[in-house]
Amino acid sequence: MSRRSTTKKSSITKIIASIVAVAVVALGGFFIYKSFLAPSGDKIKSEQTYTASDEEKEYLANKFKGLLATNSETVGYVYIPGTQLDEPVVQTTDNATYLDKRFDGVNEPLMGTVFMDADNKKDFSDRLTWLFGHARGSKVVDHRMFKDVNYFSRQEYFDAHPYVVIETPERKYYYEAVAMIIVPEETAFYRTSFDDDKDFEKQLGIIYDTAEVKKPNVKVSAKDKYLVLSTCREEDDTIRANLYLRQIPDSEVSDFVKQHGEELKYKPTRE
């Protein structure tokens, strides 16, 4: 065999080896991307955002046009399907004004308006948002404000009314009841900010573990957002009833509405 033939074969061998090496590197890179860099199905799902439908946007625009015309401090609307809790929500710079000030601006003790804590973001984006309202039943025979929140201290009522809906000018938020606790008026649980995820989970964990009325097998997670409906107990003005609710994540809203849509629809009960 000539030197030329040997050289030619050697060149072909080198070319083939180079092609194989490139293929191996490319294939390895693909597997690394799939294993470590490419977003998983769960991650993509968790990052999904909720977009209000045109129908929902029109409904909210019409509703809040009237609400904001009556009270420019309106930030939302809260109702609990199957109950008579059906109230606009306001926010101002303090937590005292709306204890007596009605939604239309008239002062009426024991009525007032449901209001968001002054330290919360009005778009319900905080990890823990507080709404406050009177329970009027012992003083006035009606279901206005947060009277119906007190009924959640009975497990059967809690189980029968698991969802709360918050409407804002931009969209709806859906919540599921997690726990109902009765606490002193000056409880340390009244917080709107936390040091870190661990601090948040610790407080929510204590609340869930000590609650006598709750949804079973709930795992508190710092990834979730919570809403609290807080009101006084009719039998004792020094204690409070706090209903804790978990916000349905945007990644779950579409399926949640498909499953529960009819029972979540707004049905007015205000006189």
Stretches with model-predicted labels:
Residues 1-12:
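N-terminal Lys/Arg-rich, disordered targeting/topogenic segments
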Residues 16-31:
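Hydrophobic membrane-insertion alpha-helices, especially the h-region
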